[in-house]
């Protein structure tokens, strides 16, 4: 390697070997060569009207499409000739894309553990390398004057760039743009860009996020042409008066011009509201005096005052349009830039995070950029769909976890209305200790650029209300330095950072992850107090917003309603961000070509964290998990209180801070089981934060039969919005009405046929008309039930105390070690999956109009009786079999998963009908969104297709169930599934499940909660555990 390359890193004709010998990708002080300074996105319009109307700029040219591509196992394997021409065996690859999804290399999913040996700043010698090239032409007018830039919006993880064989530069940080001036290398006719992308770099140690590790040019590549004298940076702020009636648009402009040229140019600024010009101003270059050395010659400050501006919020995302034009002193336009502007003020005052003077309640979610087919390549349709789904399900905020997003994301959040936490691309979770790099000054340049460049790119977006220094990187001096940098360069927004215990000096907000409502987690040095306790700690006056909570992995989000009760109770608990938005599964195909969802390890990737990437509220195709409805219901902006029966009064409160309910209609109806007794609707007109009492009826309706009476209310939006269709339901609630019933005598038109008991040495047989029951005297089980000689059971009806473990039951045992505290491990250790059943008593009696049978079973493990179940069976003259079950539980057992009955039915009927909670899956600690009603669904719709199979599909608090010929009444939870317990426990992927004969029926008198505060430690609230020593329940079953 020649000394000239070391002393002059910008030497353009250095050989490939000389450049690679520098090993820039293993030098944390070297984050780039020749990369241009960060700035907001530029379009360089040459027409002010086009800038105002946001028309496509003629000076912006996408280079997305098919590029030439060659793959190598290490950068040193790339031949020198590639700099000048494509290799004979080069293929094509789409740009943007991740090369691991195009047939090269392997995607790796890991959460904490680094996918490479930890030896910062060094990375493996075998470092997969992708060599891209594109041949393109440039217009003559671009070559004759001005500057041509190439912009890479996202390349993972580091890359070198050549143009026509000349070395242009180097860059790393996969989530922010890298922009280079290539003007001097371009020629008339064809030009060639060559990009060498390295999978691993020292930057990889700062990108240890919980996600798939993939590589390549995965965001847009663009050519931008600017005039010789051009705009270099623009910063917009919108200070408001104390009463929010007057606003100012402050514009700070920096241009690329010399001191002698400055007098020849000026800046022209316009502010538009739609097609109405609100104001305009012009200003020559030259700043105010800064210090004893003078002024900035290349800067200009402009100001436009606005009276009674329409303020921006997520509820009412009012936007203006600012056009900033660079002109000659005579008024000739050189170029123009334009940005959406939202007038709003973010501040922390008296311990509260305020927007426009109102305390926010963050209804937030963490979102990775993930597409099941395209990996980390995001398209506009997917981004819009995510935003619309968030808005439809009452989210008002999103955290860009854990890196700056595609630039379009912020524009869409501005326009649709979402509060954004913009997060720097820094995570060192796998370091030991975690702050190893964060407290090392050698890594300060890399940290600094990742934070400062994010702020410089994104600061003009009104949707961004909080800056984040990164995620799970411990806490060190680098964080303190960057916190201070942001506070100086953008004092209009608070800074958030969770590391170091969530309440360090580098955060304006106490922002823990997975702190619980009422349980302390006193980890050494970084305790997680219960959230209500945290805000009452001495000298703690900051607001608390959970940066992550409610880990939505698989069948989860149990106990979610408790968080929202606390948020509404304590003003300084200002909400949080659910983890997370979408399951990060990728589409893969089996040997037969069938597509399936793949997770960690499915590509042969090592190391991997298996299905820990499946923790979203949505499936990868954006189909909702049932837990999404729980979030929607808990976060709804309209709250209801049932006040009185006569007259029937309802108190309705709006939690909107800025929005009048001008597109809301309240619908209500009162039902008796499956019958609507009375209903009505009325427009809902509420001012922000207002309460109104509505009289629905003067008196409640009378009823003439037994049943449960419910008042159901919902709020719909009759007109479509930018993010929802007409009649979108945005809020709902219901109450069981305590009405005394005066019922007539019960009567039954069905003919009474007393059952007959027949006893043999092996069986007790009971016959009633066409019905025939058989109890095995040895096993004590209901072995078969015939109707007109057709058998109804494939397996006996028997006790069930376990479930196919949820991710929350398995905990960290599913990753890399066994956790004896996990519920699944406790159940295994207790022997609940290997119980030996013995019938210790069975007795049958013939009564006048019924047969009465008593059975008693004990359940042993390792010789010890753990459970005892006594059942009283009564078969009456109408063919109804009633089962009273009493279960005694040994005190040595952990909480049971369920106490119930299970069997395999022979019938496979298409529809299921029930009266109880529905229509979607619900569990004892996740049923806020479910409603009591009469529901009908196809059998297959009762199953939730979690990618990693587990217990699913329960419906709680059921009063009546009808399935085929079966009719069951009582007070129970039920599940009907084509997949049995054994298969759900042993199968690793949903697509491998095979429908079994018949249908499995679970009837639970009791079911343990599912938890969801997190997925790696037991999180089911004590109220939702089954820790009693005795349980009793009853069901009545008949066949028609």
Swiss-Prot record:
Molecular function GO terms recorded: beta-galactosidase activity; carbohydrate binding; magnesium ion binding
Gene Ontology CC terms, in alphabetical order: beta-galactosidase complex
Binding site residues for Mg(2+) 2: 608
Alphabetical list of PROSITE patterns matching this protein: GLYCOSYL_HYDROL_F2_1 (PS00719), GLYCOSYL_HYDROL_F2_2 (PS00608)
InterPro entries, alphabetized: B-gal_small/dom_5 (IPR004199), Bact_Beta-galactosidase (IPR050347), Beta-gal/glucu_dom_sf (IPR036156), Gal_mutarotase_sf_dom (IPR011013), Galactose-bd-like_sf (IPR008979), GH-type_carb-bd (IPR014718), Glyco_hydro_2 (IPR006101), Glyco_hydro_2_AS (IPR023232)
Sequence positions that bind Mg(2+) 1: 427, 429, 472
Catalytic activity: Hydrolysis of terminal non-reducing beta-D-galactose residues in beta-D-galactosides
A Pfam short name: Glyco_hydro_2_C
Domain of life, source organism: Bacteria
Cofactor binding annotation: Binds 2 magnesium ions per monomer. Binds 1 sodium ion per monomer.
Site residues by UniProt (Transition state stabilizer): 368, 402
Cofactor: Mg(2+); Na(+)
Entry binding sites for Na(+): 210, 612, 615
This protein's record includes keyword Hydrolase: yes
GO BP: any one term: lactose catabolic process
Tagged with keyword Magnesium: yes
Catalytic residues, chain numbering: 472 (proton donor), 548 (nucleophile)
Family: Belongs to the glycosyl hydrolase 2 family.
NCBIfam families in the cross-refs: PRK09525.1 (NF007074)
Name of this chain's protein: Beta-galactosidase
Organism for this UniProt entry: Pectobacterium atrosepticum (strain SCRI 1043 / ATCC BAA-672)
């Amino acid at each position: 390697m020649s000394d000239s390359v070391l002393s002059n890193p910008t030497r353009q004709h250095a050989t490939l070997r000389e450049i690679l010998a520098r090993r820039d990708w293993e030098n944390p002080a070297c984050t780039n060569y020749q990369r241009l300074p960060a700035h907001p996105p530029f379009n360089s319009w040459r027409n002010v009207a086009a800038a105002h109307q946001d028309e496509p700029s003629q000076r912006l040219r996408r280079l997305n499409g098919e590029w030439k591509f060659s793959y190598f196992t290490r950068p040193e394997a790339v031949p020198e000739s590639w700099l000048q021409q494509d290799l004979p065996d080069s293929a094509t690859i789409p740009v943007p894309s991740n090369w691991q999804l195009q047939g090269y290399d392997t995607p790796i999913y890991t959460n904490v553990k680094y996918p490479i040996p930890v030896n910062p700043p060094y990375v493996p010698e075998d470092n997969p390398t992708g060599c891209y090239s594109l041949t393109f032409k440039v217009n003559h007018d671009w070559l004759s004057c001005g500057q041509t830039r190439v912009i890479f919006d996202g390349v993972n993880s580091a890359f070198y760039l050549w143009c026509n064989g000349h070395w242009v530069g180097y860059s790393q940080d996969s989530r922010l743009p890298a922009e280079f001036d290539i003007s001097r290398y371009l020629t008339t006719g064809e030009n060639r860009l060559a990009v060498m992308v390295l999978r691993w770099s020292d930057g990889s140690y700062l990108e240890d996020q919980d996600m798939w590790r993939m590589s390549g040019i995965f965001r847009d590549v663009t050519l931008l042409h600017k005039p010789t004298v051009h705009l270099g940076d623009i910063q917009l702020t919108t200070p408001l008066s104390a009463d929010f009636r007057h606003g100012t648009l402050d514009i700070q402009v920096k241009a690329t011009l010399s001191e002698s040229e400055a007098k020849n140019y000026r800046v022209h600024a316009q502010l538009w509201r739609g097609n109405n010009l609100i104001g305009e101003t012009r200003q020559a270059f030259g700043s105010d005096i800064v210090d004893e050395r003078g002024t900035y010659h290349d800067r200009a400050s402009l100001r436009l005052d606005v009276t009674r501006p329409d303020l921006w919020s997520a509820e009412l995302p009012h936007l203006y349009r600012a056009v900033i034009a660079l002109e000659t002193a005579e008024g000739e336009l050189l170029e123009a830039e334009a940005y959406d502007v939202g007038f709003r003020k973010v501040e922390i005052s008296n311990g509260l995070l305020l927007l426009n003077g109102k305390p926010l309640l963050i209804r937030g979610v963490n979102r990775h950029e993930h597409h099941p087919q395209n990996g980390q390549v995001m398209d506009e349709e997917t981004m819009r769909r995510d935003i619309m789904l968030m808005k439809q399900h009452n989210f008002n905020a999103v955290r860009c976890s854990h890196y700056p997003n595609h630039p379009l994301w912020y524009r869409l959040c501005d326009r649709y209305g979402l509060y954004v936490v913009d997060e720097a691309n820094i995570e060192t979770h796998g370091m030991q200790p975690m702050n190893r790099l964060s407290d090392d000054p050698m890594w300060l340049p890399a940290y600094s650029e990742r934070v400062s460049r994010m702020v410089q790119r994104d600061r003009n977006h009104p949707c961004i209300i909080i800056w984040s220094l990164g995620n799970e990187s411990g806490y060190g001096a680098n964080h303190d330095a960057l916190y201070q940098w942001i506070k100086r360069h953008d004092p209009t927004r608070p800074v958030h950072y969770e590391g170091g215990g969530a309440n360090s000096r580098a955060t304006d907000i106490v922002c823990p992850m997975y702190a619980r409502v009422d349980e302390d987690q006193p980890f050494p040095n970084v305790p997680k107090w219960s959230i209500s306790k945290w805000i009452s700690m001495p000298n703690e006056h900051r607001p608390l917003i959970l940066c992550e909570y409610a880990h939505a992995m698989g069948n989860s989000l149990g106990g979610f309603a408790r968080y929202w009760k606390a948020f509404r109770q304590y003003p300084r608990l200002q909400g949080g961000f659910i983890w997370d938005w979408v399951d990060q599964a990728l589409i893969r195909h089996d040997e037969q070509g069938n597509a399936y969802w793949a997770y960690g390890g499915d590509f042969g990737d090592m190391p991997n964290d298996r299905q820990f990437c499946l923790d979203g509220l949505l499936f990868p195709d954006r189909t909702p998990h049932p837990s999404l409805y729980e979030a929607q219901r808990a976060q709804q902006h309209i709250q209801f209180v049932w006040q009185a029966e006569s007259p029937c009064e309802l108190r309705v409160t709006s939690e909107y801070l800025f929005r009048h309910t001008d597109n809301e209609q309240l619908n209500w109806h009162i039902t008796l089981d499956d019958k609507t007794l009375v209903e009505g609707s009325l427009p809902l007109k509420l001012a922000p934060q207002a309460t109104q009492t509505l009289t629905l009826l003067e008196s409640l309706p009378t009823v003439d039969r037994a049943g449960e009476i419910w008042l159901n209310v919902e709020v719909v939006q009759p007109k479509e919005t930018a993010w929802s269709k007409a009649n979108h339901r945005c809020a709902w609630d219901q109450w069981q009405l305590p009405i005394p019933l005066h019922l007539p005598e019960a009567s039954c038109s069905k003919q009474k046929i007393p059952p007959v008991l027949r006893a043999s040495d092996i069986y007790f047989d009971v016959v009633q008309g066409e019905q025939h029951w058989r109890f095995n005297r040895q096993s004590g089980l209901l072995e078969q039930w015939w109707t007109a000689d057709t058998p109804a059971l494939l397996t006996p009806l028997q006790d069930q105390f376990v479930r196919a473990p949820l991710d929350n039951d398995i905990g960290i045992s599913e990753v890399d070690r066994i956790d004896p505290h996990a519920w699944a491990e406790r159940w295994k250790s207790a022997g609940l999956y290997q119980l030996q059943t013995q019938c210790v008593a069975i007795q049958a009696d013939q009564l006048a109009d019924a047969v009465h049978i008593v059975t008693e079973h004990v359940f042993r493990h390792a010789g010890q009786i753990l459970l005892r179940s006594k059942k009283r069976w009564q078969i009456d003259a109408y063919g109804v079999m009633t089962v009273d079950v009493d279960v005694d539980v040994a005190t040595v057992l952990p909480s049971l998963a369920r106490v119930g009955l299970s069997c395999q039915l022979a019938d496979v009927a298409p529809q299921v009908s029930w009266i109880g909670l529905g229509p979607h899956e619900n569990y004892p600690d996740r049923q806020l969104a479910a409603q009591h009603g009469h529901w009908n669904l196809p059998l297959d719709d009762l199953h939730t297709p979690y990618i990693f199979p587990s217990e699913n599909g329960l419906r709680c608090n059921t009063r009546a169930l009808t399935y085929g010929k079966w009719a069951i009444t009582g007070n129970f939870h039920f599940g009907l599934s084509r997949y049995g317990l054994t298969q759900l426990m042993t199968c690793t992927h949903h697509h491998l499940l095979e429908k079994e004969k018949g249908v499995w029926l679970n009837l639970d008198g009791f079911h343990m909660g599912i938890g969801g505060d997190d997925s790696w430690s037991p999180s089911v609230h004590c109220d939702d555990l089954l820790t009693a020593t005795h349980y009793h329940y009853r069901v009545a079953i008949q066949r028609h």
